[in-house]
Each structure stands twice: as C-alpha cells, then as structure tokens.
Amino acid sequence: MAKLLAKRLGVMYLDTGATYRSLAYAAVQAALNPITDRHRLAILARRLPLILQPTPEGGLRVKLAGTDVTTQIRTEEVSEAAAQVSQYPEIRAAMVALQRRLARQGVVVEGRDTGSVVFPGAPYKFFLDADPDVRARRRQQELERLYGSRPPLAQVREQLHFRDGLDRHRRVGPLVKPAGAIAINTTHRSAAQVVRLILAHIHRRRS
C-alpha cells in the first residue's frame, strides 16, 4: 500500500523495515549471533553499506555493498533475525539516523515506529491494522510471490504474533499508534481502497 501511495503522490517510497532486514541479512552472512554479538552488530549498524533505489514500479531495490539483496532480505530466517536485532537501543539509534538520512526529501515511509520515533513530526500519519487471520493470509501470499512456495497459514500466523509481541514490548520504539495518526482497519479493504482513503484524508487536510 505504501508503494502504491508513493507512486500516486509521485514521491520516493521508503520501507524502514528493509533497513533492519538488511542489517539482519548482513549479520547472518557474517555469522553474527543476534543475541550474543550485540556489540559487533551495533558497529555493523553504524557502518552498513546500504543503498535503497526506487524502481519504475514504485517499489524499492535494496543493495548491500553493491549487491542486490531485495529478495534475500525477505526470508523467514532474516525476518526472525531482524526482530531480534531491532530490540537493542544502540542499533535502533543507528537505524533511525540512517532512515532520516535516506528521507531528506519528501517520501512515503512505511515502518513500525515511523510515526512515533523516526518521523514524529510528519504532517500525515496513518496507522494500519487488520484481523490477524487476514494479515497472515496476506503475508503467506507475499511469501509465495517471492519464493514460489506457500508456508502453512498457522506457521505464518504464529510468526506474526511473535513479531508483534517483541515489537510491542521492546523498551525503545515499541509498536504503538502514533500521536495524531489516523487509524485505518484494512481487513475488508483492498490496497487500492486504502490508498484512496488515505489520499482523501490528505486532500481534505490540504484544502
């Protein structure tokens, strides 16, 4: 949805989750343990050779040290590692600084602490949610598109539940509805319908 919105507005799309996934992928490649190698992970976070490039379709190409890792950072192994490394305050501080550098011009930013921590002063903030089963089915379909295989729905639902729990209870940048954000339940709405609703809110604020 954020990609589609950015395309409609004619601005860059930034997925802050991709920065954590990129760090997690680099950590996995370097055989760093997300629990025991905290100090080395923090150093890696501050020096992460990350480039995000917008695609003609409105998406984002992710490059680490010049290598395209757009697909590789979406595996479940990387997702689990990203959930772990994102718990540490020093790593989150490095990632927030990186995200702010990447968004020096007008962008649509997607992320779990975007409106509360990274860009609390953003002029437009939206908090999207959906029924857990619907979220699990959407994630299952995303994994099938990326890798050609469909993991069991129960497994995907459990992974989302685990990730939500970690994010809601972390000490720094927990998952919350940001102050001033408009909540939108997407359970019975398509991506296009949600984008139209968001654009309507933006146009009303501007007029």
Please annotate each region the language model reported.
Residues 70-146:
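ATP-dependent NMP and nucleoside kinases share a basic, alpha-helical "lid"
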Residues 20, 38, 42, 88-96, ...:
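Amphipathic alpha-helical transducer elements in NTP-driven molecular machines
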Residues 17, 66, 95, 108, ...:
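Residue-level signal for inorganic ion chemistry
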Residues 63-70, 137, 141-145, 166-207:
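NTP-dependent small-molecule kinase module
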Residues 113-115, 126-134, 145-159, 164-169, ...:
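Anionic, Ser/Thr-rich low-complexity intrinsically disordered regions
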Residues 1:
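Hydrophobic positions on the alpha1 helix immediately C-terminal to the Walker A/P-loop
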Residues 4-73:
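N-terminal phosphate/diphosphate-binding loop that engages ATP/GTP or pyrophosphate donors
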Residues 13, 125-127, 181-184:
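Conserved beta-strand scaffold positions in the cores of enzyme catalytic domains, especially
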